[in-house]
Every structure is written in C-alpha cells, then in structure tokens.
C-alpha cells in the first residue's frame, strides 16, 4: 500500500483484537472517510458493511475476500487477495454495480423503520405462530392473499441467498428486477414472481399476526416485530453497491463452483 501512497484505516474493534497500532475508525464512520472498503469475512460481513455504505450515501467500492464458508458475494479467495488489491489500487479491476433495495415499515401511516439492503427483505412467522395471511400488492394492483410461513422480496444479487433456498429463481445480478418468493406457501400454485425494477411491493400481514412473533428482517442483519395491518413497502433503491469482481472467474463460474454444478 505504501507504493500506492495509500493509508490503511482499520475498523476500531478489529484493530484492538489484533493489537494493531494503526489509524482506526468505528465501523459506522468508515464509509464516510475512506475511498475503498476491504472486507475480510463471509457474506454476512459484506452485507453488514454494504448497508452501512448505502446508509451514508458513500460512492465507494468494496473488495470482499472470503474468510467464511460458502461465500457467494465474497467470491474473491484468500489466494487472490493481493492480486485483486493490486488491480483495485491500479484502477484496472472490474466492478459490478449491484442494485439495492429500500424497505420501509409503516404503522398507522407512520414510518417505523427504513433500511437499505443488498439481498432481501423477509417477512416471516415465529416458530410457534400459525400460518399467516399476507396481502400483497404491486403498486396499486392487488396480487393475492398468500397463505404461507412468510415472503421474501429479493434483489437479483439476493436471488442466490434465502430466495434460492426456498425455491426461488436465480436471476443474474445485473438484471434490473425484484423477486417475490413465498416461503412454504399453503397453495402450491403460489409461485415466485419476477417483477420490473420500478415496482413497489407492499406486504401487509392480515391474519396470524396478533401474537407478536411475526418479524421482518433486512439482509438477516436486523429485524422488526410486525403488528397486524403494518405495511412493509419494498422498492429498488436509488443507489447501488460497487463490488469488485474476482479477477479469474465470471458469474457463471462462481455459480458452478458454489452450487457444485455438474459434479457427482
């Protein structure tokens, strides 16, 4: 980094754990004061920092190296860390623009919480809750009352996360779309729907939601308990996340590797 005239800034608690005598910033303050973020961890670490970057409005790229398990988003391996960092600092690395989602929870016409997420917004019942009725609209058009354990509104980037696990489609991350996927629907014909990016999805619990166990979660990082007739509004965010790509693999190579396609 010295050769590139770059001053590294470490996250405060991480530097303390490693007993590093370096410049540090709190995690929430990092995006506003740096030109690039290097993440070492799994997809959860990336999602946590992606939300912070989006909330601050910082227009900075992220280089994510997989120190975790599966690592769909943190696709750069440890062996590729230094070559990838060199390309990023030289300005020759390839960047993806990953679309994000904006989620607003409204109660009695008042905003309870607003979040920006990269993967998905999930509405789900508690372990001891009955099956829910979720009234779903897209814009001004009513879609259906879904009887299900929950519902996922995912971005194309999030299509390979929880959405994929419950039978949703894989959507290329550069496609401009939203994905609406029911979780364990009572009716088998309630299938996932791919929507235009300009859509606003509105989800309202109307039955099975009066036991204080229904929650909406944002990228699995943060959750809010829902009441009956709360409305969860999900739409495409105005900004996107700049994510450095692995230097030696394209998106389909990542799918083959992570999903073990064509392996016996």
Positions of PLM-derived features:
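ATP/NTP phosphate-donor binding region
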Residues: 1-36, 40, 79-94, 105-115
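Redox-cofactor binding/interface segments in oxidoreductases and associated redox assembly factors
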Residues: 39, 47, 153
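N-terminal glycine-rich "phosphate-gripper" loop used for MgATP/nucleotide binding
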Residues: 39-43, 51-54
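Short glycine/serine/threonine-rich phosphate/pyrophosphate-binding segments
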Residues: 44-50, 160-165
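Short, acidic/small-residue loops that bind anionic groups at enzyme active sites
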Residues: 57-75
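Catalytic core of DAGKc-family lipid kinases
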Residues: 69-149
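ATP/nucleoside-binding phosphotransfer catalytic cores, i.e., glycine-rich phosphate-binding loops
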Residues: 123, 139-142, 190-264
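Gly/Ser/Thr-rich active-site loops/lids in small-molecule metabolic enzymes
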Residues: 141-189
């Amino acid at each position: 980094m010295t050769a590139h005239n770059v001053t590294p800034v470490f996250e405060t608690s991480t530097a303390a754990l490693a007993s590093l005598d370096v410049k540090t910033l709190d995690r929430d303050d990092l995006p506003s004061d740096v030109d690039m973020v290097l993440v070492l961890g799994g997809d959860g670490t990336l999602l946590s920092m992606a939300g912070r970057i989006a909330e601050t409005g910082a227009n900075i790229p992220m280089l994510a190296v997989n120190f975790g398990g599966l690592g769909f988003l943190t696709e750069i391996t440890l062996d590729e860390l230094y070559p990838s960092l060199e390309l990023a600092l030289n300005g020759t690395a390839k960047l993806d623009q990953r679309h994000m989602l904006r989620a607003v929870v409204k109660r009695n016409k008042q905003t309870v919480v607003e979040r920006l997420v990269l993967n998905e917004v999930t509405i789900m019942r508690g372990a001891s809750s009955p099956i829910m009725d979720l009234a779903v609209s897209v814009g001004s058009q009513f879609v259906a009352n879904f009887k299900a354990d929950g519902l996922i509104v995912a971005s194309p980037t999030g299509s390979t996360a929880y959405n994929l696990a419950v039978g949703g489609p894989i959507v290329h991350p550069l496609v401009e779309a939203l994905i609406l996927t029911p979780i364990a629907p009572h009716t088998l014909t309630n299938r996932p729907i791919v929507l235009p990016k300009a859509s606003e999805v509105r989800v309202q619990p109307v039955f099975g939601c009066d036991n204080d166990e229904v929650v909406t979660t944002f990228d699995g990082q943060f959750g809010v308990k829902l009441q009956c007739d709360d409305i969860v509004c999900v739409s495409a965010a105005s900004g996107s996340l700049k994510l450095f790509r692995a230097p030696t693999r394209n998106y389909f190579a990542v799918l083959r590797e992570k999903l073990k396609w064509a392996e016996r």
